[in-house]
Amino acid sequence: MFIASAYAQNTETSIEHIKKVAEHANRVFPPFDFVHFSSHFFWLAISFGFFYLFISRVIAPRIGGVIETRRDRIASDLDQAMRMKQEADTVVETYERELAEARLKAHTIAQAAGEELKQKAELERKEIEERLEKKLADAEKQIAKIRDKAMQNVGSIAEEVTLGIVKKLIDVDINKETVRSVIKTANY
């Protein structure tokens, strides 16, 4: 029973609905009805006017302000970037100039140190040469003294040996002065 009454109620609603649809089926959709064209055009013009005023007075200035702010920010950023680039270029130029000066100074110092070392080495070499020449001269003097002393001894020994040889070989006595003069002429 309960199901039958609900179904019956539902069936009546469907029939009423079909009757209402049939009434409206012959009518035209209101936006497409040319009878109301002037009213539609009026409200279109008023809506467009409100939208135009709203966009021109509220939205366009805001968008313009945002665009102007963005343009100003971009210009500011470009100016700042240009300024920073100029500062960086100045720093690089200063760095390169100071580096070149430091290299030149280092080269000058190295040359001066090299020249100083050359001069010191030359002075030391000359001093050593002078000392060596002095020692060599002293050594030559000592050698000459020793040679002269040895030659004096050799001369007397040679005289005695010569006298002894001559006496043994030919059994003749010779004068010492004769032997001495012969030995001197033979040595020099």
From Swiss-Prot:
GO CC terms: plasma membrane; proton-transporting ATP synthase complex
Record's keyword annotation contains Disulfide bond: no
Cell compartments where the protein resides: Cell inner membrane
Keyword Transmembrane helix appears in the UniProt entry: yes
InterPro entries reported in the protein's UniProt record: ATP_synth_b/b'su_bac/chlpt, ATP_synthase_B_chain
Membrane topology: Single-pass membrane protein
Alphabetized UniProt keyword annotations: ATP synthesis, Cell inner membrane, Cell membrane, CF(0), Hydrogen ion transport, Ion transport, Membrane, Transmembrane, Transmembrane helix, Transport
Family listed: Belongs to the ATPase B chain family.
HAMAP family documented for this protein: ATP_synth_b_bprime
PANTHER family to which the protein is assigned, alphabetical: ATP SYNTHASE SUBUNIT B (PTHR33445:SF1), ATP SYNTHASE SUBUNIT B', CHLOROPLASTIC (PTHR33445)
Protein task: F(1)F(0) ATP synthase produces ATP from ADP in the presence of a proton or sodium gradient. F-type ATPases consist of two structural domains, F(1) containing the extramembraneous catalytic core and F(0) containing the membrane proton channel, linked together by a central stalk and a peripheral stalk. During catalysis, ATP synthesis in the catalytic domain of F(1) is coupled via a rotary mechanism of the central stalk subunits to proton translocation.
Subunit annotation: F-type ATPases have 2 components, F(1) - the catalytic core - and F(0) - the membrane proton channel. F(1) has five subunits: alpha(3), beta(3), gamma(1), delta(1), epsilon(1). F(0) has three main subunits: a(1), b(2) and c(10-14). The alpha and beta chains form an alternating ring which encloses part of the gamma chain. F(1) is attached to F(0) by a central stalk formed by the gamma and epsilon chains, while a peripheral stalk is formed by the delta and b chains.
Name listed for the protein in its UniProt record: ATP synthase subunit b 1
Source organism per UniProt: Bartonella tribocorum (strain CIP 105476 / IBS 506)
